[in-house]
Regions:
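Conserved N-terminal subdomain of the carbohydrate kinase-like
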Residues: 27-29, 36, 51-135
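Structural motif
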Residues: 4, 135-136
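Glycine-rich phosphate/adenosyl-contacting loop at the front of the ribokinase-like
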Residues: 1-61, 68-70
């Protein structure tokens, strides 16, 4: 049996807005569609690796909020080890506002890392026992 892969990364809730054109500073435009979904480079890597058949241990911090609940349900549904995903009260889970111009495909993104920004080196010490069991560590 192969050993798991440990991934240190961020989860953000992606809020994607599609529009015919991007607004100018101070302007409001009507959008065509909106989608809420999971995001974050590390989280996306963890999900892709899991779907490819790897056992995954994901390391991050999320808020104890609705977006954090979405993350935990996603990881449970995907079969990702969440032992070292810490839920932090009073700090929100990260979010990204993604505006996509449907004509050109170009986008503009604002990312707020939220609780993941509270990760510190000591957190890796706390996860050391899990990391030691893994064949790879990605950050």
């Amino acid at each position: 049996m192969s050993r798991p892969i440990s991934i240190l990364g961020i989860f953000v809730a992606d809020l994607t807005f599609r529009t015919d054109r991007m607004p100018h500073q101070g302007e409001t435009v009507i959008g065509n569609s909106f989608k809420l979904g999971p995001g974050g480079k590390g989280s996306n890597q963890a999900i892709a690796a899991r779907r490819a058949g790897a056992e995954i241990m994901f390391i991050t911090k999320i808020g104890k909020d609705t977006f954090g609940d979405i993350a935990m349900k996603l990881y449970a549904d995907e079969g990702i080890n969440s032992e070292f995903i810490w839920e932090i009260p009073k700090i929100s889970t990260g979010a990204a506002a993604i505006m996509v111009n449907e004509q050109s495909g170009e986008n503009s993104i604002i990312v707020v890392p939220g609780a993941a920004d509270a990760l510190v080196p000591d957190d890796l010490d706390d996860a050391e026992s899990g990391i030691a069991e893994c064949s790879f560590f990605m950050a």
